[in-house]
Amino acid sequence: MTNSIKREILSALNDETKKVISKLQQTNNLIKQLSDEKKTLEQYLKDNVNNHEIVDLDSDLKIKIYDLTSKDSIVLDYDKIITDYKVDTKKYETIKKGTTSTRITWSGADK
């Protein structure tokens, strides 16, 4: 009787351990994905917006960027950039102009 109780307890602990390990793996995968997306976004900005400052990241994952060179505010669709601007081994594919950003004339004060 005691051995069967021990087996049940060990089995339950083993199941819980597997669940925890699975959650940790999911978390690690998410961290890696976010890190990759951050690198992709940074590369997009480097390639497409020479002198920029990220102004805001709203809840819809739209990124407002103030282009210090042209004095324009650019609204980028983060999800679309990540989808369209994929890393291809060591080079980056060119993003399709006009489909991922909307250019808005900047009417604010100069920085």
Swiss-Prot record:
Source superkingdom: Bacteria
Name used for this protein in its record: Uncharacterized protein UU153
